[in-house]
């Protein structure tokens, strides 16, 4: 059973983070970046996928909180919503990055090594 190239996967994850943060810095230079968050570890019963990455900025978080308050009439205070949404990469999807073909190939190598006989 082939083993994944863990160093290559780690390097890919690092490069995705660097590229995403640089992209947001270029496109939204006035915004304050506070995090790059991997999320959506996903398998569709056929394939395992590389996680998505969202970049969190204070300004994006403020927009997401406002959206939640306006659309859902949240009973939580603004501070409580900020706290609960700050680390939710899926809610910060406006600044979402995909790993592309390289990420999917890396995920497939992990899937093949972990359970080659699995019915995904």
Q: Model-derived features: where do they sit?
A:
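Short N-terminal edge-element motif at the start of the domain
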Residues: 1-37
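Low-complexity intrinsically disordered segments
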Residues: 2, 75-120
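Generic structural motif recognizing short loop/turn segments at the entrances and edges of beta-strands
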Residues: 5, 29-34, 46-51, 81-93
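Non-transmembrane, interaction-prone segments in cytosolic or luminal domains
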Residues: 16-20, 24, 48, 53-55, ...
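Short, flexible coil/linker segments at or flanking structured domains
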Residues: 21-26, 41, 75, 80
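N-terminal interaction modules that seed assembly of large macromolecular complexes
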Residues: 27-68
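The catalytic "switch" region of P-loop NTPases
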Residues: 68-74
């Amino acid at each position: 059973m082939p083993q994944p190239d863990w160093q290559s996967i780690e390097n890919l994850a690092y490069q995705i983070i660097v590229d995403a943060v640089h992209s947001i810095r270029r496109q939204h230079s006035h915004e304050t970046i506070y995090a790059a968050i991997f999320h959506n570890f996903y398998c569709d019963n056929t394939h395992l996928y590389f996680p998505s990455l969202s970049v969190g900025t204070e300004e994006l978080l403020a927009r997401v909180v406002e959206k939640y308050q306006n659309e859902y009439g949240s009973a939580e205070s603004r501070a409580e919503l900020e706290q609960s949404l700050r680390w939710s990469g899926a809610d910060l999807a406006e600044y979402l990055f995909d790993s592309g073909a390289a990420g999917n190939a890396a995920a497939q190598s992990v899937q093949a090594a972990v359970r080659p006989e699995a019915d995904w």
